[in-house]
């Protein structure tokens, strides 16, 4: 269990670093958020396996479903944003059109 929790902690720290160090590219931000959800899933699996309860493993499937929907919606918004503004730089797309 310790190895899985360590893996989850390392993945979470990498994703947190990706969010804080790269605030310009929306694609990297989406990937970091997905990696953060993956690290939480690894921890759910580790605790579910240790306690012998399948509820944590079942909960992972729901999280993966929500994460897939989030990624699809995020990429659709990103494509629309690129078509209208010709950039995906966060600093340039933070204003609303009036």
Curated annotation (Swiss-Prot):
<comment type="subunit">
    <text>NDH-1 is composed of 14 different subunits. Subunits NuoA, H, J, K, L, M, N constitute the membrane sector of the complex.</text>
</comment>
<dbReference type="Pfam" id="PF00420">
    <property type="entry name" value="Oxidored_q2"/>
</dbReference>
<dbReference type="GO" id="GO:0030964">
    <property type="term" value="C:NADH dehydrogenase complex"/>
</dbReference>
<keyword id="KW-0813">Transport</keyword>
<dbReference type="GO" id="GO:0050136">
    <property type="term" value="F:NADH:ubiquinone reductase (non-electrogenic) activity"/>
</dbReference>
<dbReference type="InterPro" id="IPR001133">
    <property type="entry name" value="NADH_UbQ_OxRdtase_chain4L/K"/>
</dbReference>
<keyword id="KW-0874">Quinone</keyword>
<dbReference type="GO" id="GO:0048038">
    <property type="term" value="F:quinone binding"/>
</dbReference>
<keyword id="KW-0812">Transmembrane</keyword>
<keyword id="KW-0520">NAD</keyword>
<keyword id="KW-1003">Cell membrane</keyword>
<keyword id="KW-0472">Membrane</keyword>
<feature type="transmembrane region" description="Helical">
    <location>
        <begin position="27"/>
        <end position="47"/>
    </location>
</feature>
<keyword id="KW-0830">Ubiquinone</keyword>
<dbReference type="GO" id="GO:0042773">
    <property type="term" value="P:ATP synthesis coupled electron transport"/>
</dbReference>
<protein>
    <recommendedName>
        <fullName>NADH-quinone oxidoreductase subunit K</fullName>
        <ecNumber>7.1.1.-</ecNumber>
    </recommendedName>
</protein>
<dbReference type="InterPro" id="IPR039428">
    <property type="entry name" value="NUOK/Mnh_C1-like"/>
</dbReference>
<feature type="transmembrane region" description="Helical">
    <location>
        <begin position="59"/>
        <end position="79"/>
    </location>
</feature>
<dbReference type="GO" id="GO:0005886">
    <property type="term" value="C:plasma membrane"/>
</dbReference>
<comment type="function">
    <text>NDH-1 shuttles electrons from NADH, via FMN and iron-sulfur (Fe-S) centers, to quinones in the respiratory chain. The immediate electron acceptor for the enzyme in this species is believed to be ubiquinone. Couples the redox reaction to proton translocation (for every two electrons transferred, four hydrogen ions are translocated across the cytoplasmic membrane), and thus conserves the redox energy in a proton gradient.</text>
</comment>
<keyword id="KW-1278">Translocase</keyword>
<keyword id="KW-1133">Transmembrane helix</keyword>
<keyword id="KW-0997">Cell inner membrane</keyword>
<feature type="transmembrane region" description="Helical">
    <location>
        <begin position="1"/>
        <end position="21"/>
    </location>
</feature>
<comment type="similarity">
    <text>Belongs to the complex I subunit 4L family.</text>
</comment>
